From Swiss-Prot:
This is Aprataxin and PNK-like factor. Its EC number is 3.1.-.-. Its main location: nucleus. Residues 468-497 have a biased composition (Acidic residues). It comes from Homo sapiens. Residues 406-416 are annotated as: Flexible linker. The gene is APLF. Changing residue 182 to A: Reduced interaction with XRCC5 and XRCC6; impaired localization to the nucleus. Residues 225-249, 263-293, 324-344 have a biased composition (Polar residues).
């Protein structure tokens, strides 16, 4: 991609970049010209093939000034004139003068940046000493020696694990000549990071191999790790570089506990077999304690889940309890796996694991549900019931169920504590919840005399000669008036007259 061009006003102002192709210049916002002596279409600038040319298209001419000459010359209209970087042109004789500037392309900019980086790297490498570059193979050889020593120790103690480690060591040895054959020289800051990464990788490789296993294999790996740290210290002290000493400190911090154990055993000059026995005993004790810790929370979890499931009786709530116990057991199992990795084999063989507990819990739920099955209320619609809600089927029985047609609600006996519905069997409410909460037994026959008389079974003690009682009583006086009253003829005539008067008034109002 070729570079572009820019126009720089001589009077000052922002540069104007020219797009590839033709651009019409004149009065307007592009060049910021407001003088009416300049036309809106004064000239055409064309960028093509990495070159710039101008063609005046207005009667007022444009002026050209080369970089060598100092005088503006008028251009002929409708003729192309090539402009080079450093040349100038103007739209008026003494005003609106623009200078041509070239913009380098992206490829050229990348090339210049690369060249400048190469020069900077060469200067830096010439100024810096060669010690870090020379120490690089020493560090790689030191790392290989450390890895070799760990390999020898592991082949003596654990031949099964040595096969995989030999493959890793061969891969590392294959990578070392590739690093040595590279001729590319890195900057100093990249070399520093590379050296620090290698120093950190030595203890990471030696420590990462001692992760899994139990019993004598772990003891042998610990001993091989101690041997590697001792040999590494000797070689790192002989090298005498600050970076190697930092790696020594890292390995020393990681193997601090194992060094203390090794020093106590070597000071007493005890045989390796006895030390291995003591270490294996301590590790077995740790494994047993971890297994006991794992058993306790599992048993507690089983008790809690069984207690929760026993309290739930409906099938819907039993499902919720089962899901809750599953979630709790899965969460507890994850936490136990994170706490101990060495006791995985024992915990897997343990009969009190979450899966067996869950199976027992489901069995107990099924047995409890069968034993405590409650007789449901018979649905009033019977075979014509259209409801499909499972809760409805839990509370009401239908034709085909074992408890359909019998006693509607368990507990409708003398021990039923539910309140009695005031309407009894004649209750018109059809809400099933109402029938569950209230009893609907036959109501006792009301005694009208008992309700009217306050003193039931007691003799009448009223004084019949009391004047107060005589005043309240009213004598019945028969009359000739009949209850079916019929209006007389006079009343009918009055009503007819009134209706006629009303109609006459309405007729007069219309006129």
């Amino acid at each position: 991609m070729s570079g572009g061009f820019e126009l720089q006003p001589r009077d000052g102002g922002p540069r104007v970049a020219l797009a590839p192709g033709e651009t019409v210049i004149g009065r307007g916002p592009l060049l910021g010209i407001t003088d009416k002596r300049v036309s809106r279409r004064h000239a055409i600038l064309e960028v093509a093939g990495g070159q710039l040319r101008i063609k005046p298209i207005h009667t007022n001419p444009c002026f050209y000034q080369s970089s060598e000459k100092s005088q503006l010359l008028p251009l002929k209209p409708n003729l192309w004139c090539y402009l080079n970087p450093g040349d100038s042109f103007s739209l008026l004789v003494d005003k609106y003068i623009f200078r041509i500037l070239s913009i380098p392309s992206e490829v050229e900019m990348q090339c210049t940046l690369r060249n400048s980086q190469v020069l900077d790297e060469d200067n830096i490498l010439n100024e810096t000493p060669k010690s870090p570059v020379i120490n690089l193979p020493h560090e790689t050889t030191g790392a290989s020696q450390l890895e070799g020593s760990t390999e020898i120790a592991k082949t003596q103690m654990t031949p099964t694990n040595s096969v995989s480690f030999l493959g890793e060591n061969r891969d590392c040895n294959k990578q070392q000549p590739i690093l040595a054959e590279r001729k590319r020289i890195l900057p100093t800051w990249m070399l520093a990071e590379h050296l620090s990464d290698q120093n950190l990788s030595v203890p990471a490789i030696s420590g990462g191999n001692v992760i899994q296993g139990s019993g004598k294999e772990e003891i042998c790996k610990d001993k091989s790790q101690l041997n590697t740290t001792q040999q590494g210290r000797r070689q790192l002290i002989s090298s005498g570089s600050s970076e190697n000493t930092s790696a020594e400190q890292d390995t020393g911090e990681e193997c601090k506990n194992t060094d203390q154990e090794e020093s106590t055993i070597s000071s007493k000059e005890m045989p390796q077999s006895f030390s291995a026995i003591t270490l294996s005993n301590t590790e077995m004790n740790n494994i047993k304690t971890n297994a006991q810790r794992n058993k306790l929370p599992i048993e507690e979890l089983g008790k809690v889940s069984k207690h929760k499931i026993a309290t739930k009786r409906t099938p819907h709530k039993e499902d919720e309890a089962m899901s809750c116990s599953e979630n709790c057991s899965s969460a507890q199992g994850d936490s136990l796996q994170d706490e101990s990795q060495g006791s995985h084999s024992e915990s897997s063989s343990n009969p009190s694991n979450p899966e067996t507990l869950h199976a027992k819990a489901t069995d107990s739920v099924l047995q409890g549900s069968e034993g405590n099955k409650v007789k449901r209320t018979s649905c009033m619609y019977g075979a014509n019931c259209y409801r499909k809600n499972p809760v409805h089927f839990q509370h009401f029985s239908h034709p085909g169920d074992s408890d359909y047609g019998g006693v509607q609600i368990v507990g409708q006996d003398e021990t039923d504590d539910r309140p009695e519905c005031p309407y009894g069997p004649s209750c018109y409410r059809k809400n099933p919840q109402h029938k569950i909460e209230y009893r609907h037994n036959t109501l006792p026959v009301r005694n009208v005399l008992d309700e009217d008389n306050d003193n039931v079974g007691q003799p009448n003690e009223y004084d019949l000669n009391d004047s107060f009682l005589d005043d309240e009583e009213e004598d019945y006086e028969p009359t000739d008036e009949d209850s079916d009253w019929e209006p007389g003829k006079e009343d009918e005539e009055k009503e007819d007259v009134e209706e006629l008067l009303k109609e006459a008034k309405r007729f007069m109002k219309r006129k």
